[in-house]
Amino acid sequence: MTNIRKSHPLMKIVNHSLIDLPAPSNISAWWNFGSLLGLCLGIQIITGLFLAMHYTSDTLTAFSSVTHICRDVNYGWIIRYLHANGASMFFICLFLHVGRGIYYGSYTYSETWNIGILLLFAVMATAFMGYVLPWGQMSFWGATVITNLLSAIPYIGTDLVQWIWGGFSVDKATLTRFFAFHFILPFIIAALVMVHLLFLHETGSNNPTGIISDADKIPFHPYYTVKDALGFLLLIALLLTLVLFSPDLLGDPDNYTPANPLNTPPHIKPEWYFLFAYAILRSIPNKLGGVLALVLSIAILAVMPLLHTSKQRSMMFRPISQCLFWVLVADLLTLTWIGGQPVEHPFIIIGQLASFLYFSLILILMPTCSLIENKLLKW
């Protein structure tokens, strides 16, 4: 008799995706972040669901409802901080996952890569709207500043902003719709994840060498299920350490002050994971130019498959490209630091140079470097 795992219509799909899936034998810990992102999404959906049971999306009671969750709801404080710090973990895993894709040339699977970019945009949108919900000072002013950027769009900009706000300023209508979108988007993300995996399983996983590994595959279970389980354990340990010992480490103290439209905070800045994009936005004095640069800072990932000029897929055996990759990482860390600094000398010029370097590396330096490496190999 055939095993139910291989014959049952539903079990068969799970079996082909998680159990009998042929996987390369040499994928390293950098390949753990896909499953860790799945875990993060699960944690966010579950904690978010419990928070939504107690939260009220009204400007008069939103801040109080979050306080009520932390003080009066059973274990509400841990649910709230798991959700807030879970977002930070989500982005840490996302950045490492994308970084691994760039380093090992996984972007050559263009369908999987493009769905991944869509996922990145969706997660960023969800996180932004979630940050508005507690209705603290940074929530309100962050929402005002970022939504206002759309007014830079020629002709329809102002109407578009007022349509999104549901009025002439960020108010009750804005908060209600942001809550609705923040609730539905994670489920859209989960659906996109399925498409992402569907495309990935069409081609099979890449591996550190970038060489086709069809000749040397091993079953996903037990080898990579055990490896993923260890990753889960480490991620949960890190998240719980953050939540139980220093829950406000990555937050902004201004968000513990209720939103006040009459009082602007001295430094309006987003959560740490958006600071690099915020620094790129601020580095261009023109409003429309800044908005375009902001969108392009993520959208530029879509041109990476087109700019792959190397004869080798992975950077594993390309030392010059490796150097440029780590310069890119250092540049993004610099942009993250600049995004949190006030707009004054010398931070303005550092931000402009770092932004210029970011686009130059991806569009010019890395493809040129790949061509030089091809020449060095006499190909």
Swiss-Prot record:
CDD domains: cytochrome_b_C (cd00290), Cytochrome_b_N (cd00284). It is a multi-pass membrane protein. GO terms for biological process: mitochondrial electron transport, ubiquinol to cytochrome c. It is found in: Mitochondrion inner membrane. GO terms for cellular component: mitochondrial inner membrane; respiratory chain complex III. GO terms for molecular function: metal ion binding; ubiquinol-cytochrome-c reductase activity. SUPFAM superfamilies: a domain/subunit of cytochrome bc1 complex (Ubiquinol-cytochrome c reductase), Transmembrane di-heme cytochromes. Gene3D superfamilies: Cytochrome Bc1 Complex, Chain C. Heme b b566 binds at residues 97, 196. The cytochrome bc1 complex contains 11 subunits: 3 respiratory subunits (MT-CYB, CYC1 and UQCRFS1), 2 core proteins (UQCRC1 and UQCRC2) and 6 low-molecular weight proteins (UQCRH/QCR6, UQCRB/QCR7, UQCRQ/QCR8, UQCR10/QCR9, UQCR11/QCR10 and a cleavage product of UQCRFS1). This cytochrome bc1 complex then forms a dimer. Component of the ubiquinol-cytochrome c reductase complex (complex III or cytochrome b-c1 complex) that is part of the mitochondrial respiratory chain. The b-c1 complex mediates electron transfer from ubiquinol to cytochrome c. Contributes to the generation of a proton gradient across the mitochondrial membrane that is then used for ATP synthesis. This is Cytochrome b. The gene is MT-CYB.
